[in-house]
C-alpha cells in the first residue's frame, strides 16, 4: 500500500512538472508526459489526478484521458496511445477508437447535454500542426462562439448530404468547408477519414488540416456536421486554432465534473 502511494505521488510530481512545461510552451512533448502520469496514477491509486478522467476500458492503445489545459481551463481529450496529431495514419487505419464520439459524450455529460445526441451549442476541434502546441493528438471541447454559430446556421440550408461545400469565413480571415453527414449518430461517423478524403487532392499534407465537429439543424432535425480548414487556404490571413472557434465554458453550464 505504501509503495503504491509513493509511486502515485511520483506520478503526480511528473505530471505537474509536465504541466508547467506545457503551460509555458517549453516542450511539445509535455502533454504526452501528463497523459502517461495520469495513467500511471490511475493504475496505482484508482485516481485520475491530475486528469479529470482516465478511461482504459479497451486497454491503453484504445484509451483516453480528459483534462484541463494549463491556465486557459480548456477541456481536452487526449488518447493514451501515442498519436502525433491529425496527420497520424493510425486515425484512418480502421483500428482507431472514435475519439470524437468519446469527446462529444464526455463534453455533453459535463454540460448538461443529451449524451451522444447532436447539440447545437457544442463543438470539438483538432488543430493543425501549425497551430497546435503539443505533438500528441488532443481534441478541444467547448461551445461554438456566437459568431461561428451564426455563420454555420446561415450556411446550413445550402449544404447537401455527403458533399463538401465552401461556407466562407466561419471566423474572421479563415475560410472553412462543411460536410453535412446526414447522421445524428457520431459513433457511426469517422471525421478524421472524412476530412482526409475530402482534402486529399487539395493540400500537400494532412498536418495542415484543422478538423471540427459540430451540429446544425436540417428540416427540423439536428445532424452532425464535419468542418475543416487548412493552413494556407486561399484568402486566409493566418491559421486558425481552437481558441478562435470555441468558448472554453458553455454559457450557464455547471462546473465541469466527471465521475469515474
Where are the predicted features?
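HIT superfamily nucleotide-processing domains
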Residues: 20-260
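Bacterial N-terminal signal peptides that target proteins for export
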Residues: 1-9
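Bacterial N-terminal signal peptides
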Residues: 8-18
Amino acid at each position: 500500500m505504501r509503495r503504491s502511494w509513493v509511486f502515485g505521488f511520483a506520478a503526480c510530481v511528473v505530471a505537474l512538472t509536465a504541466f508547467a512545461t506545457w503551460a509555458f510552451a517549453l516542450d511539445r512533448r509535455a502533454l504526452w508526459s501528463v497523459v502517461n502520469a495520469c495513467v500511471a496514477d490511475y493504475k496505482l491509486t484508482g485516481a485520475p489526478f491530475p486528469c479529470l478522467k482516465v478511461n482504459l476500458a479497451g486497454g491503453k492503445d484504445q484509451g483516453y484521458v480528459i483534462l484541463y489545459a494549463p491556465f486557459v481551463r480548456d477541456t481536452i481529450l487526449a488518447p493514451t496511445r501515442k498519436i502525433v496529431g491529425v496527420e497520424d495514419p493510425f486515425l484512418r487505419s480502421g483500428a482507431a477508437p472514435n475519439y470524437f464520439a468519446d469527446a462529444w459524450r464526455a463534453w455533453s455529460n459535463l454540460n448538461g447535454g443529451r449524451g451522444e445526441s447532436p447539440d447545437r451549442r457544442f463543438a470539438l476541434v483538432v488543430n493543425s500542426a501549425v497551430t497546435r502546441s503539443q505533438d500528441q493528438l488532443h481534441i478541444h471541447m467547448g461551445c461554438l462562439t456566437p459568431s461561428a454559430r451564426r455563420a454555420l446556421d446561415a450556411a446550413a440550408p445550402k449544404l447537401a448530404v455527403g458533399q463538401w461545400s465552401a461556407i466562407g469565413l466561419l471566423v474572421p480571415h479563415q475560410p472553412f468547408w462543411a460536410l453535412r453527414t446526414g447522421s445524428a449518430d457520431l459513433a457511426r461517423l469517422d471525421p478524421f477519414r472524412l476530412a482526409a478524403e475530402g482534402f486529399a487532392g487539395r493540400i500537400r499534407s494532412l498536418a495542415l488540416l484543422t478538423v471540427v465537429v459540430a451540429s446544425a439543424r436540417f428540416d427540423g432535425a439536428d445532424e452532425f456536421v464535419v468542418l475543416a480548414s487548412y493552413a494556407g487556404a486561399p484568402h486566409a490571413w493566418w491559421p486558425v486554432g481552437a481558441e478562435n472557434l470555441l468558448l472554453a465554458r458553455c454559457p450557464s453550464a455547471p462546473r465541469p465534473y466527471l465521475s469515474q
